[in-house]
Amino acid sequence: MQTLSQHRWYHRVLLLVVITALIVIVSWRLASTQGLSSRLEDAYGYLANSSSRTNASTDTLIGSLQERLRTNPQDWQSFSQLGLAYLQKARETGDPTYYQKTEEALDKALALQSDDYVSMSARGALALARHDFSAALEWGEKARQINPDRTYAYGVIADAQIELGRYEEAVETLQTMVDLRPDMSSYSRISYIRELHGDVDGALEMMQVAVDSGTPNAESTAWVRTQLANLYFNRGDLDQAELEYRLTLQNHPDYVYALAGLGRVRAAQGERQEAIQYLNQAVTIMPMPEFVIALGDLYQAAGDQESADQQYQLVTAIETLYRANGVDMDMEIALFNADHDRNLEETVALARKAYANRPSIHGADALAWALFNIGDYEEAQQYSAEALKLGTKDSLKLFHAGMIAFELGDKAEARAYLEEALAINPYFSILYAEEAQRTLEILK
């Protein structure tokens, strides 16, 4: 199972970024008519903060926009709004088939209005969701050139820069973003960049600011609070993590990210059956790959290999669906295969391809672990060192580094990495936490 690190969750749907990345507040070019102005305001209020969620659903918004377009097929603003609504629907359901609908709506908007800032930015967000980070960066830069004073594009640009390993540039982008508009979207991204650089306290502080800046009942606030809970989990603070997950569920009883988080808390506490119940609930609502993998790992840990294999087969089916809708799953599947001893030689090739497309610390870690699993420990160590270059307090990456050092016979380094991994979070992985402890005992 992957660690509950902020990145892995932020990134599995940086498996995503549209399924899981924040839909930021976007400023529209308002038309002179009051009717159009009202329509744009309504759409942005809904899509940005979900503050109108108590009065309307995404389906209602989509239906309304489709009806407008039937009577006025040249209405580029409605096409742009519809594209954003489809992105939100993908976020709510985890259904990647909405990506093609998003692309079609946004491309129609751009065909009618080639310099539409919002549609360009949203095209970038769609590219992020599909893990085409170079394209996302290109779309974001195009949008920024049109209007450098609006913030939506900066979020797209920063997310792409992070996934492309351009961390210094991402810091500069986010500083500009927060200077222009200090809000939930910029705060949460700054939290993430702090986490990547090993400043966990600073990440927690900024994520709390992001939570406090949100509308209490908004889905976006639920998402950010769940990220706050994940940060607490990643440092081994199960009580605070559970508190934040439960606060999320008070306003959103079926919020899958919080349900899955509680499942991991229960797993860490040794309550496997309750953990399975929570993750089963999450998978039933939204079969996201990370939920399905975690559930399979729990079944495996409980000795129910048949149920585990059923979940792992589902991962393969989900991969097929994602790829059919333009989502690059190379890195995620490489990690999954390496963790579960599947097609190891092919997995190395997949991990190399993933790293070439997204040369981030996460891509380096995936390649290191794939190489480890075929016994190429020296090359694995090179990429593992790269994965740790920012000082990220990620127990799984440290575990990988420790096991690589162990196989290379460097006992002191192996012990140091494994001790640090367990000191940060002794519950970091269902698959590997106990193995880390056993290996430390051998080293002692």
Protein language model features and the residues they cover:
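N-terminal leader/linker segments that initiate helical-solenoid repeat arrays
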Residues: 2-118, 138, 426-427, 433-444
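Short coil turns that delineate tetratricopeptide repeat
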Residues: 73, 114, 148, 181-182, ...
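Canonical tetratricopeptide repeat
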Residues: 81, 122, 156, 189, ...
